[in-house]
Amino acid sequence: MTTRIKVDLRSDTVTRPDEPMRRAMHEAVVGDDVLGDDPTVQELEARYAELVGKEAALFTPSGSMANQIAVAAWTRGGDEIICGAQCHILEYEYGAPAFLARVLAREAPVRQGSPDPDAVRAFYKSGAFHSSRTSLLCLENTHNRLGGVIADQGLFEEL
């Protein structure tokens, strides 16, 4: 007998915690994360840093916040970023790259859930004479507006 599990990858907002998850949230030891006193957040950040092979990790309560921190950290005011068409940063984050990081977002056509590498090459700007500098390529996986499609890993590698 085959068991089918439905996984909805459109957005983190469509997830629903089951009873064991709710129990874990209820029983979690908490503290003030701003003061560095929340052991649950500390454990989560340490586990994730180890998982991805980094020195440290930062918990953010939303994907939008994580996106905007990354954009601000990897760019300077006046830079350009390239995003895939209909990506979350462009469609659902209220112009935050322009407002918070002071960068212009360019929208590249998407192929199989990924910005098209040929379009990205065509849009890239070095920052030479009278042009802004492309400083960041934003990749979304899974692609929200395309129904949660998983981006083609080969295209990501090409980028």
Segments (PLM) and residue ranges:
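N-terminal amphipathic/basic leader segments beginning at the initiator methionine
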Residues: 1-24
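Solvent-exposed alpha-helices and their adjacent loops that cap or buttress functional pockets
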Residues: 2-3, 49-52, 73-75, 98-100, ...
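Conserved N-terminal alpha-helix of the aminotransferase class I/II PLP-enzyme fold
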Residues: 17-63, 85-91
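Conserved core of the PLP fold type I
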Residues: 55-75, 108-109, 141
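Conserved PLP-anchoring active-site segment centered on the Schiff-base-forming lysine
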Residues: 73-94
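Active-site-proximal loop->helix
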Residues: 92-104
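PLP-dependent aminotransferase-class I/II
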Residues: 101-158
